[in-house]
């Protein structure tokens, strides 16, 4: 029975013979022309296929005996497979356990084999212990004691496996070689008999703890031998790549491990072969680059993705993908952009370019991004949209906006050079912002940030120069800037500052045709509209300062041009309606002008009442305008809003009182009508004068005849 079991064992283990690692063992069946393939003749020396699980050659006779034994074992193995793998366990009696009577530690101590597995394997006492175990088995057929079981119980599967492979390469005598060979076979058979999967053996060998150094560990040979044994016996399709990928925790971890392994001489060859196998597997499975990006967990944070070493794995995959798919030209930057979006990629690269540790990589990827856009036939306008500059330029961090502007500018240069185009950054921005008005406004907002100021000022200058070269008048630029929508909008629109910039440049080139912002506004809207808007705006806390400055400029402009009060009255188109409630702004402006006029010309003073009275055509027309306004204010409950009408009424009625005109004489002396035929407004004038007259008369009487106490 013992000889029979040995034959079966020999059959089991001989099926494990073969190459240790090659691309056919690691990779998917589909070849990849861009990846180095390891043929048998190119496999590393330490992985040569003839180095495992063969009993060393001695004599021709012994070889013949071994061949006969092997064939017998294989035949028996075939029968076993047919009847079920479970029966194999019945023939194998080499499980890793200690004797029932003595613990493994005690046995090793007796034979002085407990001072390290390496020493134990080359100790003469190993043979003595082997004989002892064989004797136990002979005396007690139920004994499960085995040398490999005792060693494993004390030292562990991983330490024993590693030491056996190492010893196999260093022992000298034929007996020692045979002993190591038997122990290695015994270890494999013990795992098999206890239904250990290849994944279980990976765990037993503690390869995960070795990280990338596992690729150079002798334990890797043991894992590969066991995997081949399982594949032969079970007709399995397990590969070293799959086993390691599962064992190390997935493809992302495996990819990182292989990258690290490629950096070291002792692990480079196997790491390269396994990486090629991994890339081939993905290509065969028809994964798109973005899918591999997700597999490598580069899809969660772009900045981290750029610093993650597995980005090199993705880059390598893209090269293989393009070779296998000539019609598709994927790129690393294109894959990132497809997942994260062009704008986010640009933002992160701008930030990374300011970090000394990532600057070089960021600049290279920035160049790749420009090339990717060009290869995909992107226009300058499309790149503007991709970068979302319309939203970003006036609203976000100036440094980021500046970086995006520079990126767009560089793309335009590349586009013009490669496509013989004539695009400009200014033209692209103008289109992107739907016109010069929006662009100018965005540039004004962005110029306050020191990071973007230089680029923004440059663009402002180009826009101004473009208008100057066209010979545009300031009023035309006013329209280009969208300042022709009404004076109220002008005062709150920042583009008035851009118009001021243009006027300054215009004046510097047109010395004999100089103008100003207030003159430009007046030329477009009219003095009266501008004056009214400025007077109203002075009551708005947000616009008061701007309105006051512009109003002062308007008044001084009239003065410097020699305008009289009558001229300004005419310019302002003052009429009866200017006395109406909430409508007296132009009369107030006239009063401000007369005050300034009198301040400048103290020798000749102008009386505002006289100017207004004369321009209205005398007392009657002025009285009709003033009383009409007062009546409307009473009807609308707005008496407090007609202060200027009240002042003119008091001044007018005061003159009549001073001329001793009694109320009953107003019809005939002032209005030139018969009282019976007077209209409602004329009767109202008389009524209001009567009230005024009585009040003034009462005051005069009280002063002349004070009441005695």
From Swiss-Prot:
Motif (RxLR-dEER): 51-66
Keyword ATP-binding recorded: no
Domain of life: Eukaryota
Induction remark: Expression is induced during host plant infection.
Broad class of where this protein is predominantly found: secreted
Record keywords: Host cytoplasm, Host cytoskeleton, Secreted, Signal, Virulence
Compartment(s) where it occurs, according to its Swiss-Prot or TrEMBL record: Secreted; Host cytoplasm, Host cytoskeleton
Keyword match Lipoprotein: no
Signal peptide, first to last residue: 1-18
One Gene Ontology cellular component annotation held by this UniProt entry: host cytoskeleton
Recorded family membership: Belongs to the RxLR effector family.
Function: Effector that enhances P.infestans colonization of Nicotiana benthamiana leaves.
Domains (record comment): The RxLR-dEER motif acts to carry the protein into the host cell cytoplasm through binding to cell surface phosphatidylinositol-3-phosphate.
Name by which UniProt lists this protein: RxLR effector protein PITG_15110
Species assigned in the record: Phytophthora infestans (strain T30-4) (Potato late blight agent)
